[in-house]
Amino acid sequence: MKEYQIHLELDRSQQHNFLYPLLFREYIYTLAHDHGLNRSTIPLENGGYDNKSSSLSVKRLISRTYQRIHLSIYAKDSNPNQFIGHNNQFYSQMISEGFSVIVEIPFSLRLVAFLEGKEKEMAKSHNFQSIHSIFPFFENNFSHLHYVLDVLIPYPIRPEILVRAFRYWVKDASSLHLLRFFLHEYFNWNSLITPKKSNSIFSTSNPRFFLFLYNSHVYEYESIFFFLRNQSSHLRSTSSGLLFERISFYGKVEDLVQVFVNDFQDNLWLFKHPIMHYVRYQGKSVLASKDMPLLMNKWKYYLVNLWQWHFHVWSQPGRIHINHLYKDYINFLGYLSRGRLNTLVVRSQMLENAFLIDNAMKQFETTVPIIPLIGSLTMARFCNSLGHPISKPTWADSSDSYIIDRFMRICRKLSHYHSGSSKKKSLYRIKYILRVSCVKSLVRKHKSTVRVFLKRLGSEFLEEFFTEEEHVLSLIFPRALFTSRRLYRGRVWYLDIICINDFVNHDKFEIVPN
């Protein structure tokens, strides 16, 4: 075990000491024009942010903050350590956003170095950056499996755990102190990682810092799996891949090496199952195996011990579920997925004798979760808790074209995202709710009734709510109208979707604290 720890420390040896001079010295111009970042053609995870968060702006803000502190010292006897105050929220927010940019530099440099010389491979696999590419992976690899481990990755509720994980990769005492300061100032520890419920300025106004900390924590969690798999060369997997996308990276790893450690101290056993798949997006991961309930229970025990002893997080029983793929649904990326056995009857005749043969065809089914979607529409004030459409009073002062365009965009995005559903009936119901809500919003604005309003505009009003997706497919296949209609009734995965829809993301990064 000590030998593995030594190798792990060597793998983490690429540490940087430039955060302190970057913040408080004049070397900022050198790093701001670093050739390694500028020459990269790989789209990094959090690229394209506002120039207000640039490192040069942060340096100027720090200088202005120190000037204000010195002036306050000469003006009156005040405490210069009161950095975050009611009047200084703008300065603290700007510095924290700039700090997020700065701490991403070493990880971006490592990513550029790792992907150097692989631009052609990344260009070929550009479509795999889409989160919809996960579902064809499910269809190709999960249809012959039986058991699924549904895992909700916990998040540490103590700030020192985050600082300790970050300390493995960045060797700079000043930046660690600054990170600890931001964590203690901004986090509401009673509702950690619940930005939609927390009143914290950090969680609502600095999502970049939040995503960086979350991804670094998950990266630390997953690095143990990949490190032990690479070290066990005699059990090396046949194929593996790591794919990056713009929100958070996920991995599709085949033939994982199973690692079971007893209290992470004494003994280490390595064994491998020939059919094992792992997929993760944000805080939820799926581990699938074929007809091995004992193996899945060992994985569950291993994960609980990993969280408890390495991350000091007490795992609740509801975070890990062992489900049968053909009996239970997998709630992943806004879809309910499971395996399904379809019986196909084949008539075979030999001379004068005829036989009926039942063939069980295994398929992977994806459906729309109608109840969570109605809950999201209820929170957005498009319908009530029973799914009955209501008007949108906040848009009553807008023009008719604006109201119709807003409803059409929402309906188009939901149809686009749920185009891979096996059953379109639930999607039709969502479209109906949005259509009637749009009509009621217009009726409320014009102080009329639904019957009079539709009679004046005609029965063909807002038919695009139901024909928009079919129209898009007809543009893709202009010479085959029948093909486009058949695809519309079937499942279509769009590989240009790189993030989950707000109405689909029912959790929205929410992880209940332990």
Curated annotation (Swiss-Prot):
Belongs to the intron maturase 2 family. MatK subfamily. It comes from Acer palmatum (Japanese maple). It holds the Pfam family Intron_maturas2. Usually encoded in the trnK tRNA gene intron. Probably assists in splicing its own and other chloroplast group II introns. It is found in: Plastid, Chloroplast. HAMAP family: MatK. This is Maturase K. Keywords: Chloroplast, mRNA processing, Plastid, RNA-binding, tRNA processing. One of its GO terms (biological process) is RNA splicing. One of its GO terms (molecular function) is RNA binding. GO terms for cellular component: chloroplast. Disulfide bonds: none annotated.
